[in-house]
Structures are given as structure tokens and as C-alpha cells.
UniProtKB/Swiss-Prot annotation:
Protein name per the record: Probable delta-1-pyrroline-5-carboxylate dehydrogenase
Active site: 298, 332
A GO CC term attached to the entry: mitochondrial matrix
A Pfam match: Aldedh
MF-aspect GO terms: 1-pyrroline-5-carboxylate dehydrogenase activity
Organism: Schizosaccharomyces pombe (strain 972 / ATCC 24843) (Fission yeast)
Enzyme class of the recorded protein, top EC level: oxidoreductase
Record-linked InterPro entries: Ald_DH/histidinol_DH, Ald_DH_C, Ald_DH_CS_CYS, Ald_DH_CS_GLU, Ald_DH_N, Aldehyde_DH_dom, P5CDH/ALDH4A1, Proline_metab_enzyme
Family label: Belongs to the aldehyde dehydrogenase family.
Reactions catalysed, as given in the entry: L-glutamate 5-semialdehyde + NAD(+) + H2O = L-glutamate + NADH + 2 H(+)
Documented EC number(s): 1.2.1.88
Gene Ontology BP annotations: proline catabolic process to glutamate
PROSITE patterns, per database record: ALDEHYDE_DEHYDR_CYS, ALDEHYDE_DEHYDR_GLU
Recorded metabolic or biological pathway in which this protein acts: Amino-acid degradation; L-proline degradation into L-glutamate; L-glutamate from L-proline: step 2/2
């Protein structure tokens, strides 16, 4: 398709937040959208192949985590044949999609961002609240802001990647780089905890001209379905994106057994990602694929805060409470282990931390706007966390400073809990819990090097971490000592809340491939570069001067 100009993208900026204060139009808007969506439940969601709704008659249910008797959505689950059909539909649609000029692909996602910012903001937030248990603010920064930022900034970063061309051309030669889509299809496996991430797992490879199969989380099907519908309304061709809710094992098996499998875009647990990588690796060894698949994944974390004796105590406490207990500790970046100097601990940190955590209100999003902590996502998560709390209550090495209770009579509610231990190698500092449980270790002020070693070696993860200190010499020392402990490192700020366009997100070690969502780096994983040398001069002799 011809394009007779080099178009310039509109100015790309972060979506400004709405604050939803008392009596505001924003609060009125989200409450209205929430009630309207609630009245429509349960929503019936099909498998979508080549733009056509497919009813499989194998039904799954997404339930409301704060009212688990309430069914949010009944969704048709794709079987093996449906996945095969979806792959073939994607491959048929590949030529049309990848031949569409970048300006048109960008326009689709810029329009999608605009639709979310305006027409669908409250609806997408409401689906995220009802289906995934977020309060208004957590839904806003996810489904009302971050997803928009991903869609907008991706176009900027893609434009910059395409503009990356060879710096030199010898006389009579024009050298160029072309960034081709991958040969085959990309498989996107999305998580429950961020609607924005689910959208970006599909949108990032799509923008680069790839066709995508999107498998939504069983616990976030509704919000992912709305995102799919928004992409289609924005002009995305039917063949470019297939929507295939279903059993993760069955869907993945079909995708990974197909010779045209070209890429995996994943957010989820470390154990699952390792298993998927192993399957792909075995298939590569057996020569199953046409090309080596690109594997991009962001997984677990056991994220830390280190509080030095020079830290401003109130700020360090506030940041710890927010990082540990916003969205019930179910962010990949959530604070899970806290290392506090003895001086800071005894000079106000302990009392302030305990007071702040005990003051947090727990409950459903709109029953009380003051509710800070909501439910964990499902029964399995609740059971795991309840077992941890019961074990902690009888463990002689642990003191429960706050919380410790769990109740699933109506929803999956776990109290925000603080566990103190003198054993820095205890399981509570090692294992990812993915819930509102914060483990604290108090270190001697002169043992800073030792605590750095603990932070760096206690867990296999390397996702996020923060240090709190006013002494700049200490800041420099800790920044250097903890260089590989976190892919996102914060100084005097919480370890959550990375902003697209400001802090590209991702970690290494067991936390993933560190390809940095919200940056051009991740887009570069979904292209296959071609170097082109265009020579204008004629060759007139086989021999070189040295041959004479």
C-alpha cells in the first residue's frame, strides 16, 4: 500500500489522572457506569475468531472476588479445534495487517486510546473493579490511565525504532534497515491484575505488524473482552487479533505445537513461564518451528524496601504501606519484604507503620469509598494466604504486628498483615505470596553491607526495590551494591507505580526477560530486522587493486 508522505505523530503525553473526590463529576461518572454494568451481569462472552463470535457451549465463569456468589461473566471456552481455527484466521489476516502502513496502524491504537480516555473510561474501570476487585483509584491508574499511555507511547517508540537507520553510506550506496513483523503469529497470555498489561500484551506486537492470539486470564475475561471490542471499534482488522478464552494448558499446547508460532508475550507466574519456556525450548530442539520464537515475559517478584537510619521516617512508612497494600499486594511490583535500620525502627517507624496499617479499611470498592484494601482474586489465592497467616500465628520466629485474619464468607478478604521476624532467611522473606502480607526485618545500623547481601541473595527474583536515605553517600553506595537486585530501582519512593514514558518496567533473574514494557525495547522484540544495501554504481572488474 502506498503512502505519499512521512507523517509525524501527534504530541504524545501521559493521560492526566482524574481524582474522584466527594461530589465530583468523575465520582458520579464511575458510580453510574458501575451500577449500569452491575445491572447487566452476568455478561456472556464468546470466543472470537476472524471477527466472528463463536459459541463453544463449554462455559467458564468469572466471579466477583468481593462477592463470590456473583457471576460477572459467563464465557465460552475455546477447545483445541477453535484454537487451530484462530491460528489459521490469524495467518490468513497477516498479509493485510502487515501491509497496512505504520501511520494507519498507529491511528488505530491512538483512536483506541482516545476511546478509552473518553467513551469507555468508566466502563472499563467498572469492569476492572467488579471483576478484579480494584477500588476506584487502582482502577483509574490501570484501566483509566496506564492502558492509554501504553497505546500512545508505543506509537512514539515504534516511530523512533523505524527511524533507527545506518549512520554511514559509502558513495554510491544507500543503506537501510527495515523492521519486519515476525514470520508467524504471536501468542499473548494475559494476567488478571492489570487491564493495562492485558491490553499491551496484545497491542505491542500488533502495532509492529504482527498477528496475535490473545488468551485472557480466567479472572479478567470481562475487562479483556471490552479491550478487544475497543480495538475493533478503533479499526483493527478482524484477522489481526483473535480472542480465545479457554484452558491455559489446552490453548498453549495447540499454539506451541504449530510450526508458525513466532512469539510469546506473557505476564504471570515464574513457575508457569519456566514451564512454557521449557516446552518451547524442547520444540526448538526438535526443529518444530519455522523460526526461533521470541519469548518475552514478566513474572514474579519478592520486592524490597531498605530503610536507612538517615531516612525521613514518615515518608518511608507511607511509601511502604502503599507499596505493600495497594490492590491487596497483587501487583507484580508490590512490596513484600522490608528491611529497616534499628535506629529508624525504634525512633518512630514501628509505631507509625503499625498505626497506618491498622487504620486501613477493608471491603468492596463502592460499599465505602474509604476502603483501601479489597479482596484477593480467587479462592486459591485466599487459601494460600490464609495458610501463611495461620502458620505465622503459631511460629515462634514471627511476631504479628498487624492483621493476621482472613474471611471468605462473602468475598476473599485478607487483612493487611505485617509480620516481624529476626530470621532474615525465613520463608516469609523468600517465597512470593502475592497478597497483603508484609515481612519486616530490623537490621543493626552498622550491618548495612550484610543487609545488602541479604536483599541481593535471599530470593531468586529481581523485579523492583527501593531505598530510603537522606545521606547521599549512602544513596550512592546502596545504588551500586544493589545494582542487580531490581530491574526497577527507586530512591526515596515506593517500589510500585512505574509510569509509561517515565520508568520502563521489568526485571531480570527469575522475574522475567527484562524487556521493559513501556519502552522501545519491548517493541524491538517483536520485529525481525532486515538490512538492505542499495548500490547505485556498476561493478566493472572481478579483480581488486591488490590482485595487480
Amino acid at each position: 500500500m502506498s503512502q505519499f508522505a512521512e507523517f509525524k505523530l501527534p504530541a504524545i503525553k501521559n493521560e492526566p489522572p482524574k481524582h474522584y473526590g466527594p461530589n465530583s463529576a468523575d465520582r458520579e461518572g464511575i458510580v453510574k457506569a458501575y451500577k449500569e454494568l452491575e445491572a447487566e451481569l452476568p455478561v456472556t462472552i464468546p470466543v472470537i475468531i476472524d471477527g466472528k463470535e463463536v459459541e463453544t457451549n463449554t462455559i467458564g465463569e468469572q466471579r466477583c472476588p468481593f462477592e463470590h456468589k456473583k457471576v460477572v461473566a459467563r464465557y465460552h471456552r475455546a477447545g483445541a479445534k477453535h484454537v487451530e481455527d484462530a491460528i489459521e484466521a490469524a495467518l490468513r489476516g497477516k498479509k493485510v495487517w502487515e501491509s497496512l502502513p505504520f501511520a494507519d496502524r498507529s491511528a488505530i491504537f491512538l483512536k483506541a486510546a482516545h476511546l478509552i480516555s473518553t467513551k469507555y473510561r468508566y466502563k472499563l474501570m467498572a469492569a476492572t473493579m467488579i471483576g478484579q476487585g480494584k477500588n476506584i483509584w487502582q482502577a483509574e491508574i490501570d484501566a483509566g490511565m496506564e492502558i492509554i499511555d501504553f497505546l500512545r507511547f508505543n506509537t512514539k517508540y515504534a516511530s523512533e525504532l523505524y527511524a533507527s537507520q545506518p549512520p554511514e553510506n559509502t558513495p554510491g550506496v544507500w543503506n537501510r534497515m527495515e523492521y519486519r513483523p515476525l514470520e508467524g503469529f504471536v501468542y499473548a497470555i494475559t494476567p488478571f491484575n492489570f487491564t493495562a498489561i492485558a491490553g499491551n500484551l496484545a497491542a505491542a506486537p500488533l502495532l509492529m505488524g504482527n498477528v496475535v492470539l490473545m488468551k485472557p486470564s480466567d479472572h479478567a475475561v470481562l475487562s479483556s473482552y471490552i479491550v478487544y471490542q475497543i480495538f475493533r471499534e478503533a479499526g483493527l482488522p478482524a484477522g489481526a487479533l483473535q480472542f480465545i478464552p479457554g484452558d491455559a494448558v489446552e490453548v498453549s499446547k495447540v499454539c506451541f505445537n504449530h510450526p508458525e508460532f513466532a512469539g510469546l508475550h506473557f505476564t504471570g507466574s515464574t513457575a508457569v513461564f519456566r514451564s512454557l519456556w521449557g516446552t518451547i525450548g524442547e520444540n526448538v530442539a526438535n526443529g518444530k518451528y519455522r523460526t526461533y520464537p521470541k519469548i518475552v515475559g514478566e513474572t514474579g517478584g519478592k520486592n524490597f524496601h531498605l530503610v536507612h537510619s538517615s531516612a525521613e521516617i514518615k515518608s518511608a512508612v507511607v511509601n511502604a504501606v502503599r507499596a505493600a497494600f495497594e490492590y491487596q499486594g497483587q501487583k507484580c511490583s508490590a512490596l513484600s519484604r522490608l528491611y529497616v535500620s534499628k535506629y529508624a525502627w525504634e525512633n518512630g517507624f514501628r509505631d507509625e507503620l503499625t498505626k497506618q496499617v491498622k487504620s486501613l479499611k477493608v471491603g468492596a470498592p463502592l460499599t465505602d469509598f474509604a476502603n483501601f484494601v479489597g479482596p484477593v482474586i480467587h479462592q486459591a489465592s485466599f487459601n494460600k494466604l490464609k495458610k501463611v497467616l495461620e502458620s505465622a500465628a503459631s511460629d515462634s520466629e514471627i511476631e504479628v504486628l498487624a492483621g493476621g485474619k482472613a474471611d471468605d464468607s462473602e468475598g476473599f478478604f485478607v487483612e493487611p498483615t505485617v509480620l516481624l521476624s529476626k530470621n532474615p532467611k525465613h520463608d516469609i522473606f523468600v517465597n512470593e505470596l502475592f497478597g497483603p502480607v508484609l515481612s519486616v526485618y530490623v537490621y543493626e545500623d552498622d550491618n548495612l553491607d550484610a543487609v545488602c547481601d541479604l536483599i541481593d541473595t535471599t530470593t531468586p527474583y529481581g523485579l523492583t526495590g527501593s531505598i530510603f536515605a537522606q545521606d547521599r553517600v549512602v544513596v550512592r553506595k546502596l545504588t551500586d551494591r544493589l545494582r542487580n537486585a531490581a530491574g526497577n530501582f527507586y530512591i526515596n519512593d515506593k517500589c510500585t507505580g512505574a509510569v509509561v514514558g517515565e520508568q520502563p518496567f521489568g526485571g531480570a533473574r527469575a522475574s522475567g526477560t527484562n524487556d521493559k514494557a513501556g519502552s522501545g525495547m519491548i517493541l524491538s522484540r517483536f520485529v525481525s530486522p532486515r538490512s538492505i544495501k542499495d548500490t547505485f554504481a556498476y561493478a566493472d572488474s572481478v579483480l581488486y587493486p591488490s590482485n595487480f
